Amino acid sequence: MDMLYWLLIAAVFIIAFIGLVYPVIPSVVFIVAGFVLYGFLFSFSPYSYMFWLVEAVFAAVLFAADYVSNLLGVKRFGGSKAAIWGSTIGLLIGPFVIPVAGIILGPFIGAVCAELIVHQKDLKSAFKIGLGSLIGFLTGVIAKGIIQLLMIGYFLWTVL
């Protein structure tokens, strides 16, 4: 039965990793759900206040990494707040409009459209900013993936 429980916990963690590229899936919620699931299926006794504090810090860093990577990607390539908002909206809408490819194209198209509409930038500049948005998004995915691995690694270190 323990093996089945661990598979269930692993499945919840896998869903969290899917949330790296599909922003409608709240990664942190699924990671914490894995911790709580372990507590219900096995025991909450391994969890100390320090465990929850460390995991909360990881979660805060994860949220910050997402925001900062997008911000730096757009700003580095000359984008404005409008491009950041466009990128975020594109990230949320893109996967639904263009399944799979929308994950990558959404932030790019959103940033480009925002710069073209709000600041009347020329197409070349808007594309450059869109590229910055894409680089920021991909950097954020990598950073968040590493942080999620650290969260799960600390969980495993605590309970095993």
From Swiss-Prot:
Disulfide bridges in this chain: none
Keyword Nucleotide-binding carried by entry: no
Keywords from the named record: Cell membrane, Membrane, Transmembrane, Transmembrane helix
Topology term for the membrane: Multi-pass membrane protein
Pfam families assigned to the protein according to its UniProt record, in alphabetical order: DUF456
CC annotations in GO: plasma membrane
Annotated protein name in UniProt: Uncharacterized protein YqgC
Species, as recorded: Bacillus subtilis (strain 168)
